[in-house]
């Protein structure tokens, strides 16, 4: 247990930050999974809709500081390549 007031505060902040990061990490994983599944099924319309949602959500995570801009661009780019490969 923390002995200093500042250490107690940091412990509280860490708990909040961990919960927030867990939420975004799970959301990112689920969004990516939805796009990949739609692309694997060959459903172009569903894949495009999922890609739009993914693009918006991933860039929102950038603005909140969860992931870096380049990481977001790379993820969206790779998902877009998958969707564009569908005939």
UniProtKB/Swiss-Prot annotation:
InterPro entries reported in the protein's UniProt record: Ribosomal_bS20, Ribosomal_bS20_sf
Location of the region described as Disordered in the Swiss-Prot/TrEMBL record: 1-20
Similarity-based family: Belongs to the bacterial ribosomal protein bS20 family.
HAMAP family given in the database record: Ribosomal_bS20 (MF_00500)
Name of the protein described by the UniProt record: Small ribosomal subunit protein bS20
GO molecular function, a single term: small ribosomal subunit rRNA binding
Alphabetically ordered keywords of this record: Ribonucleoprotein, Ribosomal protein, RNA-binding, rRNA-binding
Domain of life per record: Bacteria
Function comment: Binds directly to 16S ribosomal RNA.
């Amino acid at each position: 247990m923390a002995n200093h007031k500042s250490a107690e505060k940091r412990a509280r902040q860490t708990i909040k930050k961990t919960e927030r990061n867990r939420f975004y990490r799970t959301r990112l994983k689920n969004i990516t999974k939805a796009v990949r599944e739609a692309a694997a099924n060959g459903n172009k319309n569903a894949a495009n809709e999922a890609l739009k949602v993914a693009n918006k959500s991933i860039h929102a995570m950038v603005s909140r500081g969860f992931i870096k801009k380049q990481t977001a661009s790379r993820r969206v780019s790779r998902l877009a390549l998958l969707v564009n490969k569908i005939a």
